[in-house]
Amino acid sequence: MPKLGMQSIRRRQLIDATLEAINEVGMHDATIAQIARRAGVSTGIISHYFRDKNGLLEATMRDITSQLRDAVLNRLHALPQGSAERRLQAIVGGNFDETQVSSAAMKAWLAFWASSMHQPMLYRLQQVSSRRLLSNLVSEFRRELPRQQAQEAGYGLAALIDGLWLRAALSGKPLDKPLAHSLTRHFITQHLPTD
C-alpha cells in the first residue's frame, strides 16, 4: 500500500527533475530515463503518475502556469484597494517573479511555447495563460480608461512583458529586473491619465 501523501511528493520530484532536464539538455533531448534518474525513481513511476513523457510535460507546464497565477494573485491580493497603476505593477511583478525567470523556468517556457504549436493540450494551456495576462491587464487599465484604450494599453503592456522576458530568455543572462520594472512602469504611466 502506498504511503499517504506520497503521490504529491513523487509528482513534485518528477516535475522538478523535468525542469532540471529541460534546463540542461532541452525538452526534446530530455528522456524519461534521464528524468527518472534525476528524481531517483524508476521509469515506471513516471508512467504510473503521468502516462508518458507528454503527460509529464503537460503537468510541468501546468505547474509553471500555476506558479505564475499564484505570483500574480498574491501580489494583487496584497493591494485590494490599490490604484490601477500599483495593481498593474503587481501584475508585472508576478510575471517577473523568480519562479518565472529562473534559467530552468525560462527554458521550459520557451520549449512549451515552441511545442504548443504542435500539441493541442500545450497550445490550450499556453492560450489560457496568455488570455489571463491580457484580461488582468485590460481589467486594471479599464478602471481608468475607456474600453478601446484599455484593450490597446493591455495588449501593449502584455507585449512589453513578453518581449522583455523573451529577450532575457534568449540572451542566456538573467532578466534585468530593475530595467524591466522601469520600462513597464514608464509604459503604464504613459497610458494612464494624469491627476
Swiss-Prot record:
A Gene Ontology molecular function term of the record: transcription cis-regulatory region binding
Keyword terms, alphabetized: DNA-binding, Repressor, Transcription, Transcription regulation
PROSITE patterns per the UniProt record, alphabetical: HTH_TETR_1 (PS01081), HTH_TETR_2 (PS50977)
Biological process terms in GO annotation: glycine betaine biosynthetic process from choline; negative regulation of DNA-templated transcription
DNA-binding residues (ranges): 31-50
SUPFAM superfamilies, A to Z: Homeodomain-like, Tetracyclin repressor-like, C-terminal domain
Residues annotated as domain HTH tetR-type: 8-68
Transmembrane spans: none
Source superkingdom: Bacteria
Pathway field: Amine and polyamine biosynthesis; betaine biosynthesis via choline pathway [regulation]
UniProt function note: Repressor involved in the biosynthesis of the osmoprotectant glycine betaine. It represses transcription of the choline transporter BetT and the genes of BetAB involved in the synthesis of glycine betaine.
PANTHER family: HTH-TYPE TRANSCRIPTIONAL REGULATOR BETI, HTH-TYPE TRANSCRIPTIONAL REGULATOR RUTR
Protein known as: HTH-type transcriptional regulator BetI
Organism annotation: Escherichia coli O127:H6 (strain E2348/69 / EPEC)
Gene that specifies this protein: betI
